[in-house]
Regions:
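Acidic, glycine-rich two-metal-ion catalytic cores of nucleic acid-processing enzymes
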Residues: 1-78, 85, 137-202, 217-226
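Generic beta-strand/beta-sheet core signal
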Residues: 30-33, 95, 108, 168, ...
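Catalytic palm subdomain of template-directed nucleic-acid polymerases
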Residues: 40, 101-114, 203-219
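A glycine-rich phosphate-binding loop feature that marks nucleotide/adenosyl-phosphate handling sites
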Residues: 58, 110, 121-124, 136-145, ...
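Helix-rich, typically C-terminal accessory recognition domains appended to large enzymatic cores
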Residues: 104-105, 176, 238
Length: 250
């Protein structure tokens, strides 16, 4: 399921239109909003960073942390260089969080590993709490594992992959708790719903047509409840769509 191409990819729309619901029902798709960066926000535990994530423009904030634009620069939406810096930052941010090394980071901006190292070092040093988090992870790695969001042990193959593993595990735990909370709310309200797919940070449901909009709102509410249940420091939100097939609901 996770390998089905996205709507914008070749044959993606046609593939996703094949997942549909019977007459009298609607398909409800709900996605967690920016869960990877919210997981980072939880572990950074820095109010300034979380405010930028939730109320500001975290990618512009990170562009300054990487040194792609000067600190304190006000974003101009009509400036093509600002737009380019912001788009590059999105790629860099997720690349670094997913374990990209200096060579990969450098290639993203058309440079070499030396340039990539400067970018990564700048991001670590200018992101509030990130340097301290990485040092804490290094200390914990002496045991060969990290404590996950819910207390379980997460075994890590190398220190290079430690931050990524910690964030991925947190996202997976949040998503599973979200599914539990969604099921509870749907059952409490006696919603006629069946789970069709649970893919990464997305759920797809078959819901009786007259209950579809209510189901979408309940599943969105369940995301917040999941974060609260796990004492997640960064609010968890979700966005739902109602349609007739997977193309329309994701």
């Amino acid at each position: 399921m996770a390998q089905v191409p996205a709507v914008g990819s070749p044959f993606g729309a046609e593939c996703r239109e094949m997942w549909r619901v019977p007459k009298g029902y609607k398909q409800v798709g709900v996605d967690l909003s920016g869960i990877e960066l919210r997981c980072l926000g939880h572990y950074l535990n820095d109010q300034e960073w979380m405010d930028e994530l939730l109320k500001g423009d975290i990618h512009w904030f990170n562009a300054q942390s990487f040194g792609l634009v000067e600190k304190g620069t006000t974003k101009d939406d009509n400036n093509p260089e600002h737009k380019k810096a912001r788009n590059t930052t999105k790629t860099l941010t997720y690349g670094v969080l997913y374990g990209a090394g200096a060579a990969k980071a450098g290639s993203i901006v058309g440079g070499n590993s030396s340039k990539g190292k400067k970018l990564i070092d700048s991001f670590i040093n200018n992101t509030p709490g990130l340097s301290a988090l990485k040092k804490k992870i290094s200390r914990l790695m002496a045991k060969g594992h990290l404590p996950a969001l819910d207390g379980r042990r997460v075994w890590v193959r190398s220190e290079h992959a430690a931050l990524n593993t910690l964030l991925q595990s947190a996202g997976a735990i949040i998503a599973k708790q979200w599914l539990i909370e969604s099921t509870k709310l749907l059952q409490e309200k006696e919603i006629d719903a069946k789970l069709l797919a649970f893919v990464h940070d997305e759920t797809q449901w078959e819901v009786r047509e007259d209950q579809a909009e209510e189901a979408a709102r309940l599943i969105e509410q369940a995301a917040t409840k999941a974060g609260e249940a796990l004492k997640f420091r960064c609010p968890v939100n979700a966005e739902g769509k109602v349609g007739d097939n997977w193309k329309q609901t994701h």
